[in-house]
């Protein structure tokens, strides 16, 4: 998995069923950790670290907040 991938938390996580977008890949650390942004309606974005064991790949995000089109 890489930055801007859409993931869903599985049953191993308290956020199970929630969708998020990988914001950072801390691939150089061991174990590998991902910073995942989970949009919360009317509240903004919560950021959660996960080692990849409780997320499943859904797809690639096309529009990502903070990115500009070239």
PLM segments and residue spans:
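Short, acidic/hydrophobic/Gly-rich beta-strand patch recurrent on exposed beta strands
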Residues: 8, 21, 35-39
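Intrinsically disordered, low-complexity regulatory regions enriched in Ser/Pro/Gly/Thr
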Residues: 1, 28-29
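Short coil-to-beta transition motif at edge beta-strands of beta-rich domains
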Residues: 1-13, 19
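Short aromatic-glycine-enriched beta-strand elements
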Residues: 30-36, 45
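Solvent-exposed strand-loop boundary residues in beta-sheet-rich modules
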Residues: 13, 26, 40-42
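Intrinsically disordered, low-complexity, charged/polar segments
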Residues: 39-70
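Short beta-strand-centered aromatic/proline hotspots
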Residues: 16-26
């Amino acid at each position: 998995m890489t930055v801007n991938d859409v993931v869903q938390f599985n049953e191993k996580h308290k956020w199970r069923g929630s969708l998020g977008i990988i914001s950072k890949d801390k691939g150089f650390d061991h174990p590998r950790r991902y910073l995942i942004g989970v949009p919360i309606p009317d509240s903004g974005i919560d950021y959660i670290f996960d080692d990849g064991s409780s997320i499943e790949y859904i797809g690639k995000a096309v529009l990502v907040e903070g990115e500009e089109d070239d």
